[in-house]
Amino acid sequence: LERTLKYLEAKFGEWFPQIEWLNLGGGHLMTRKDYDIEHLINILNSLHKRHPHLRIILEPGSAFAWQTGYLQSEVVDIVENHGIKTEILNVSFACHMPDCLEMPYQPEVRTVNTTDNSSSTARKIKEEDITTNNTTQKSLVTESGNFLYRLGGNSCLSGDFIGFWEFDHELTLGEQIIFEDMIHYTTVKTHMFNGVSHPAIAIKHLDGKIEILREFAYEDYKNRMD
């Protein structure tokens, strides 16, 4: 923001006396732990002193929902084709996480062991960095000895997947896959392509209790089509 303002004033400052409002945009993650709030305040106060007639607008955007909710999925199938293992989840990247395909926004991915609630984080792997056994088959085990999977969604869209991820163990059916920090995208951009249901909305209390606020069914999709 500080660099942007310097450029903005240098290039467009001569027109500032003719405007009443200045919108500095969004994307300011001021709720992030290492965000320098005091520096932000000083920058805005300094700008206001230079141009006291301006009404300055700042859009915190996703800062309101930063790290406030994750998308929980489950492995429902694991398929292998030409040496590539794809774990099919009960969520859809096209329907529930379109930013992962469009931007692409890449959330942190982790697994949860439902037996002891232990968790491990997966690592995103670039396709060009994957070693090949031959011209058509990619290695299912990385050089570090970890296991390679592609994450696939549950819609009929052929492009409903997001790349390759490295896990420290072999995945099994029923295993939970968590997509961190997804609530601010999932809740506003999700859609019901071909009847794929919205994820349920729930609160996880400090004592571990899960409270379901809203669940969706086929009738929700049907009513939208009426």
Language model segments and positions:
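Charged (often Lys/Glu-rich) extended helix/loop segments that serve as interaction or gating elements
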Residues: 43, 55-226
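Active-site loop/helix belt of alpha/beta enzymes
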Residues: 1-82, 194
